[in-house]
Amino acid sequence: MVTVSEQTAQGHVIEAYGNLLRVRFDGYVRQGEVAYVNVDNTWLKAEVIEVADQEVKVQVFEDTQGACRGALVTFSGHLLEAELGPGLLQGIFDGLQNRLEVLAEDSSFLQRGKHVNAISDHNLWNYTPVASVGDTLRRGDLLGTVPEGRFTHKIMVPFSCFQEVTLTWVISEGTYNAHTVVAKARDAQGKECAFTMVQRWPIKQAFIEGEKIPAHKIMDVGLRILDTQIPVLKGGTFCTPGPFGAGKTVLQHHLSKYAAVDIVILCACGERAGEVVEVLQEFPHLIDPHTGKSLMHRTCIICNTSSMPVAARESSIYLGVTIAEYYRQMGLDILLLADSTSRWAQALREISGRLEEIPGEEAFPAYLSSRIAAFYERGGAITTKDGSEGSLTICGAVSPAGGNFEEPVTQSTLAVVGAFCGLSKARADARRYPSIDPLISWSKYLNQVGQILEEKVSGWGGAVKKAAQFLEKGSEIGKRMEVVGEEGVSMEDMEIYLKAELYDFCYLQQNAFDPVDCYCPFERQIELFSLISRIFDAKFVFDSPDDARSFFLELQSKIKTLNGLKFLSEEYHESKEVIVRLLEKTMVQMA
């Protein structure tokens, strides 16, 4: 929306603490406003984080080396905003929405003061108008459409337009760049406004027009432990806390590859640059199993790595969720992966310390919980004006020091999310992938998913709970056996322990390097879980613990082989038939 620019203020630096500057200004300034600081004739982007009388404190998003007293500061009159429109998919941005591939053309390193438009003028889009002259529209109403990959990108009345407007001119169908004016309108006061394919929105304000509805669709991710034991709904929230080396990033990469959603927003917030490079190298060559096209066609990457300024970590998190909310308004299912929210919290702690605020637990700011809650609450499912449903599922990785789940960031996250996938260093060291510990993890969506799947598989919810009980009992018996040995437990307990190990080894674990087992579709999960449930219900009588262990090891080996065979192939049916015959033979001979 094109409007008259607001009056801006100016000021001068009077004090500096790292990337935090104290500025005395003349004019009008508001909290969250974008400012530009002149350092060695380079304008550095900053954000107002505290206003007190005629002084403000601004956090600069880039290196402030060379900043001095008296340096000129200008205020834009705008909040920190995201540029939204066609062309964001397949994009690679930093936390301030600069296109990194464009910056890379100028230099191998990120030069401070460089700002690039997120949506290029060079790309042309086939615009089809939908609204007509004389139509009365409000924010979020459809102006036209352009194709973006396999999606129909809806060009909507900007969400910053809060008044009802009447269209006075509409561009004809054709090929234009994103910044071309495609419609003009007049509001009730007679004020003229023009609309392009691009709109801007403050990243720290929730972006929604429509009605929030309860999440009710299952999100299939191809990991048996998540889909069965710790399910997540589209529009839900979940977290993946774990110590260093437990596999948080690997798990998030799996979700970005195989989750049954339309668009994935990958936010690398403070993680190592090498992990981002891995994504950039792999994703263009990987095929989306749901569409058969490159994964990059549905992916947007925001990479603010640990080597970038601390202040930009916060903006990268909010930028990612704003882009996700924008695509949700088109009736699409979005998955936002934030890796890691702990780095964001550490940035908050650093800024809070420089502001001399009263610290909370472990020196984190007292408002940490409310900030984390506000972030996760931006997820959810909605019904848009045209009746379509969109969803935003948020997954946040948490990196507690030493794997301590009692620290403030993890506890604040657990209070608001719908599912908790706790990663275990012990399971990771034992090469149990994914290293999610089923004994400490939980999902508030378990009963709801059970009710949905009851229509497909009778007794699904009860069977899943029974499997979880086997795991708990098996873990208790295993700990007892470590103390007293196998001779100290009854044969019945030994059988429960071996069944729990079988379930863990053959169902909950998957081979990430196997082209078949790395992704398990839901139909295959149902069939395999039915086989495991049959083993749970079977009664065996063994002469000795060695006989029991030998039988279950053979069974494990055969089921593991089955997991690596193409689903419903001839080899698959033959292998499954061998397992069924072995079960029936053992039950007949020993029962």
Curated annotation (Swiss-Prot):
Coiled coil: none annotated. GO terms for biological process: proton motive force-driven plasma membrane ATP synthesis. Its EC number is 7.1.2.2. It comes from the Bacteria. InterPro entries: ATP-synt_VA_C, ATP-synth_a_Xtn, ATPase_a/bsu_AS, ATPase_F1/V1/A1_a/bsu_N, ATPase_F1/V1/A1_a/bsu_nucl-bd, ATPase_F1/V1_b/a_C, P-loop_NTPase, V-ATPase_asu. Pfam families: ATP-synt_ab, ATP-synt_ab_N, ATP-synt_ab_Xtn, ATP-synt_VA_C. GO terms for molecular function: ATP binding; proton-transporting ATP synthase activity, rotational mechanism; proton-transporting ATPase activity, rotational mechanism. Keywords: ATP synthesis, ATP-binding, Hydrogen ion transport, Ion transport, Nucleotide-binding, Translocase, Transport. SUPFAM superfamilies: C-terminal domain of alpha and beta subunits of F1 ATP synthase, P-loop containing nucleoside triphosphate hydrolases. ATP binds at G242, P243, F244, G245, A246, G247, K248, T249. It catalyses: ATP + H2O + 4 H(+)(in) = ADP + phosphate + 5 H(+)(out). The keyword Translocase applies. It is an enzyme of class 7 (translocase). NCBIfam families: PRK04192.1. Produces ATP from ADP in the presence of a proton gradient across the membrane. The V-type alpha chain is a catalytic subunit. Belongs to the ATPase alpha/beta chains family. This is V-type ATP synthase alpha chain. It comes from Chlamydia pneumoniae.
